[in-house]
Each structure stands twice: as C-alpha cells, then as structure tokens.
Swiss-Prot record:
Gene Ontology cellular component terms for the protein in this record: proton-transporting V-type ATPase, V1 domain
CDD domains membership: ATP-synt_V_A-type_beta_C, V_A-ATPase_B
Domain of life of the organism encoding this protein: Eukaryota
SUPFAM superfamilies, per the entry: P-loop containing nucleoside triphosphate hydrolases
Organism: Gossypium hirsutum
Sections of the chain in a coiled coil: none
Protein name: V-type proton ATPase subunit B 2
Quaternary data: V-ATPase is a heteromultimeric enzyme composed of a peripheral catalytic V1 complex (main components: subunits A, B, C, D, E, and F) attached to an integral membrane V0 proton pore complex (main component: the proteolipid protein).
Amino acid sequence: GRIFNGSGKPIDNGPPILPEAYLDISGSSINPSERTYPEEMIQTGISTIDVMNSIARGQKIPFFSAAGLPHNEIAAQICRQAGLVKRLEKAGDLLEDGEEDNFAIVFAAMGVNMETAQFFKRDFEENGSMERVTLFLNLANDPTIERIITPRIALTTAEYLAYECGKHVLVILTDMSSYADALREVSAAREEVPGRRGYPGYMYTDLATIYERAGRIEGRKGSITQIPILTMPNDDITHPTPDLTGYITEGQIYIDRQLHNRQIYPPINVLPSLSRLMKSAIGEGMTRRDHADVSNQLYANYAIGKDVQAMKAVVGEEALSSEDLLYLEFLDKFERKFVTQGAYDTRNIFQSLDLAWTLLRIFPRELLHRIPAKTLDQYYSRDAAN
C-alpha cells in the first residue's frame, strides 16, 4: 500500500520503511530445473482476456498498445478487479478466491507524465485497491538512468512477496517502450555500437533479464505473473521493442485502434491476441469444463464473421446466405456485448462463459463444430445455463 519513486524511495508522506532484507535488484539466478510450469488462472475481470486469452499464474504476457489508446485505463481496471480463481470443494464449482491477502500487485510506471501518475495514484486510492498495490513511479522528468532500475526494483519487491511471503504477485510494467528508449539513450552516451534503429545490440538480453523473472519455483507457494505494457511507435508491431518482447514472452494481448475509434472499450482485438499458456490455466478443476471449447468456437465464429463482413462490402447484403447473416449478427453482438465492458464492470469467469453461451445460441447446434456433443448437451439449452 505504499508509493515509491523510481529509485525505491517513499513519496507518499508515510512513515520511513524499516527494511527486513537487503536484496540485489538484478535478482538472484534461479535454477531452471527448480521452475515449475505455470498453472491455474489469474482472473482479470475482463471477458476477452479471461475467456479467450486466459493468463496463468507465473506467465509473462505483454499488452501491445499505441499512443492515444486506453492502455492505462485497462491497467488500472485490472488492478481493481484482478484476483485468484479458487475451487470451492463443497459445491464442486469454482469461486473467486476469498483470500485477498494472498494476492498482491506491484505496479511500476516508467517515463510517465504527471497526469498519468496522478491518474494511477487517484484511481488506486479512490477504489480501495491501494492496500494490495505497491506503486513505483518514475516520471518523464526523472533521470533516464533511474528508468533502467525501476522495473528491477519492482521485480525484486515482487520476488520477495512471492517467494518469501507466499503471495501470488501480478507485476504490471508500463511503459516498456520508455524503458527501451532509456536504454538507447544510455547506450548512446556510452558510445556503444548501435543496433537496429539505434537501440543497443544487447537489448534482447536486457529485456530477457526483466521478463524472465516471472514464473513459479518448486517448493514455494507464490508466483510472479508479468503484464508488461508497451506502446508501439506508429502502431508498428515490427519495431524492435514489441518485436523482441514477442520473442521472449508467452503470447500478447493486442489493443486495437480501429476498435477504439468505434468507441469500443476495452478495445482488445482477440484475433491477433494469444496466450500460449492458456491450456494449463483453464479446464475442469481450474475454471470450467467447457472453457477451452467455448473459446475455440468464439474465435472461429468471430473470424468467419469478419470474413463475411468483408464480403458484404463487396457483394452487398442481398447476396449473403441466411448462414452468413447469422455470422454477421454474431459479430455485431460479440463486439457490443462481449468485448464491450464498462471500466467498472467486473465479470468473473463464470459470468463471462455464460455470456459467451448466450451469444453462441444465435447459431443452431449443427453450426457449433468446435464444441463436443456432450458439452452442448450440458450447456446449449437455455435451461442448462446456470
């Protein structure tokens, strides 16, 4: 519940910090054989992420955004809503984890302007999420060199909370593009040989030293899940920062300008988004048996709907078949009801799955090819929807 500057000094007028331990901010190297595979889900309360790009505890998954898109609002919303999904043995179903004290958030902002810093501080304090958030703020007018140590201080804090205190920690780093620019600036000052677009040749290695500090360790209860946010200059996904980040991390969540221009919030485009570890975070015992099938069917139908929409622009609506019109109806409702979500509208994973079934019922059973008959029998009829 404290606020620090980019060097780790408190700036919230609170009492001085009494250190329990002094740790190297570069992190101690972890024996690869001691790492365990990320499992179980961190619930963000946002349908497009929870249902279609589920985040496992211990995963690293970046948000690819761009200037003028609401990535800060989405980050603040995740901080407000994020939590664990826990099994309730008695009912045989899952519920949101009641043990909130077992979940913590470390938020590091690098190179942000004063307005953004105030937005995060005010949002966390007003909505009661500050008590589980540790906030590090490196402002745009702070020294460049400080920007390079801010994420490392944040991750050292997260490692202590995860591996010494047994907490499941979500680390949000924004904006990694500012970090990469700081790295380029320092590299140029040291007169090192520049690489692609002036960034240093070791930027891949340097980014890996940050991203690879996510994960779980055998014999320790806690986990570190990372969500780095980066703004792509000129919406260019081939820019070195998003390009190298994509190689290191386990998927990406793509914030789309076209959806944003159509007033859809959060403007998450599910088609280029991907969570590589989703399969180990969902399913019976972790979320719900139908989760993977529903996600596959939503992806398939949304992709077909996009194709039909493009075809309609060429041949006109009169030339479309009745089946095509169903896909168009699904496309419209999917974006208006499933993707669109209020900034303070939290949906748990079961509400999101039920909403997905409501949309899939637009189609007759025969068109739902990705869902096994057994699952359809249980969930397709309206009465079966719990």
